[in-house]
UniProtKB/Swiss-Prot annotation:
Gene that produces this protein: bioW
Subunit relationships: Homodimer.
Catalytic activity: heptanedioate + ATP + CoA = 6-carboxyhexanoyl-CoA + AMP + diphosphate
Family label: Belongs to the BioW family.
Activity regulation information from UniProt: Inhibited by magnesium above 10 mM and metal chelators such as 1, 10-phenanthroline and EDTA.
Enzyme class, UniProt record, top EC level: ligase
Protein name, as recorded: 6-carboxyhexanoate--CoA ligase
Pathway: Metabolic intermediate metabolism; pimeloyl-CoA biosynthesis; pimeloyl-CoA from pimelate: step 1/1
Presence of keyword Transmembrane helix: no
Molecular function GO labels: 6-carboxyhexanoate-CoA ligase activity; ATP binding; magnesium ion binding
Length: 245
């Protein structure tokens, strides 16, 4: 267990003529005092070399944590499904969501939101049955934060490791029914469906190459205590430990 460590977070955006901003990139790491500088350099490089555009605003936050604040959990098990078309991939994702209890109505809302939004900074929380949005945060959404791997050498590439760490934290809340995600990066067409029972199911292609729409949807239960759930997602530090299966 780390006695003292630091949450190191990055957010990058590009200003537009209307006074708003386009989300470019984000990043989350947890490390020791001696790891702060190399992690900051890594996150800056990610922000400055991104396919979504040239960031003219980059924010780095370094926050001290104590070891007793950190929760440890094993990663979700990974499976991969390759489909021949976006239509078939969507059908497969919907089938999985149905199997874990997400209604067709909520699925319709989720797929519409992910296909039509190109500037979501955080996740959208949807009621798993009604499809009603619960977080009321607009494009900001809910940012899952303070997450990393205990061991950096766990296999797979950086993109999959980051997404799996996030999905693992989300799935370990009793209020999460399932997560649906695909990236807003234009070159990346793979997404996933996940929860604590089915694990992390990668599905491709969930969108066409060159498309910048995407984001994350968390389907939540009737029993959700919204303030507690959001606090867990945004504030409680988590380290993922164990080998990928």
């Amino acid at each position: 267990m780390l006695e003292t460590c630091y949450s190191i977070r990055m957010r990058a955006a590009e200003k537009n003529l209307e006074g708003g901003e386009k989300h470019i990139s984000g990043g989350e790491r947890i490390g020791s005092e001696f790891q702060i500088e190399p992690i900051v350099k890594q996150l800056l490089n990610k922000a400055r070399n991104h396919s979504r555009g040239d960031a003219d605003f980059i924010q780095i936050t370094v926050e001290k944590l104590t070891g007793d604040q950190i929760l440890y959990m094993p990663p979700l098990e990974i499976t991969t499904i390759d489909e021949s078309s976006i239509e078939r991939a969507h059908k497969e994702a919907r089938s999985i969501l149905t199997s874990v209890g997400v209604s067709k109505q909520a699925q319709n809302v989720a797929f519409h939101l992910l296909a039509s939004n190109q500037n979501l900074r955080g996740a959208i929380l949807l009621h798993s049955q009604t499809g009603l949005r619960l977080d009321n945060r607009g494009l900001k959404g809910v940012r899952v934060s303070r997450i990393d791997w205990q061991d950096a050498d766990v296999g797979y590439n950086e993109r999959v490791r980051e997404a799996l760490a996030l999905a693992t934290k989300v799935a370990n809340s009793p209020y999460t029914i399932a997560e649906l995600c695909w990236s807003d990066d234009p070159e990346y067409v793979t997404g996933y469906v996940s929860n604590h029972e089915i694990g992390y199911v990668r599905i491709t292609p969930l969108k066409r190459e060159g498309c910048e729409s995407g984001g994350r949807i968390f389907f939540v239960s009737d029993e959700v205590e919204l303030e507690s759930y959001i606090h867990y997602l945004e504030r409680e530090p988590i380290l993922i430990r164990g080998h990928l299966k």
